[in-house]
Amino acid sequence: MGMIGSGLLLIDKPGGWTSHDVVARVRRLAGTRKVGHAGTLDPMATGLLVLGLNSSTRLLTYIVGAEKEYVGTIRLGAATTTDDIEGEILERAEPAALAAVAESSIAEGIAALTGEIEQVPSAVSAVKVDGKRAYARVRAGEEVVLPARAVTVSAFRLLSERREQDAIDLEVRVVCSSGTYIRSLARDLGARLGVGGHLAALRRTRVGGYDVRRAHELATLEPAAALIPATEAASSLFERLRLTEQQATDLAHGKRLHLAGWEGPRGEPVAAIAPSGSLVGLIEFRGKEARTLVNFPADEIA
């Protein structure tokens, strides 16, 4: 194991970096190979990337599916091959067509893409098609058509609008379920308005309860100082159960707990905390019995 303990790091990813670039940098800085992330950000995007270090990579499973918040710029007036600014332009709208797009039409288009919707992911995405990433198939020259899937856009707000002759830039804020593509929202809004659209800029501002304002810049990152210890991380994600010494020992050895008085959630993870304050593991209650979902090595936990 490296010099650093187990926990989460909140990184403010710079533009131009892949999520894997960030993981590779943190591996070097932290001196451990055991680094993973809770959801990819496109290279063009900036903002919050949640990393797990050492045994806390096991927590990432429970963060990947969390609600996300973004701010971004949707550019109306052109459709692109990737649904973002990095793709080749497929078609441009005439200035007259753009000028005819009413603010009320934009509001109606946004409303139609809010709530529980069926969304077709961008062809240049990390969605797997027969075991191979869609973007890899596109780069190999294949035609990729992905099926629509259900996503939830719980908020889609227009923050500001800027009109030019060849484009309308919409600054937006989106709160959505995991698996929602903001690029696809840009594409679909442009298509609804008949002028084409793509994503010109994107910043992820929140993942679950973690806000980008708590995130650290890579350029000045000191992993040990920035680390959210595993116990603190799990306590902010889940309900907590304080164990006795005997219960902590039993759980660490894989035994099930029998707790008649538990009144917390059932069928979802609970953070099991030892009397010392360290995280023993994640457990799940079924009836009066608790089974271990994830164990955490005692020597790693801060």
UniProtKB/Swiss-Prot annotation:
One of its GO terms (biological process) is mRNA pseudouridine synthesis. It catalyses: uridine(55) in tRNA = pseudouridine(55) in tRNA. GO terms for molecular function: RNA binding; tRNA pseudouridine(55) synthase activity. The active site is at D42 (nucleophile). Keywords: Isomerase, tRNA processing. It is an enzyme of class 5 (isomerase). Its EC number is 5.4.99.25. Pfam families: TruB_C, TruB_C_2, TruB_N. The keyword Isomerase applies. Responsible for synthesis of pseudouridine from uracil-55 in the psi GC loop of transfer RNAs. Belongs to the pseudouridine synthase TruB family. Type 1 subfamily. This is tRNA pseudouridine synthase B. It comes from Leifsonia xyli subsp. xyli (strain CTCB07). The lineage of its organism: Bacteria, Bacillati, Actinomycetota, Actinomycetes, Micrococcales.
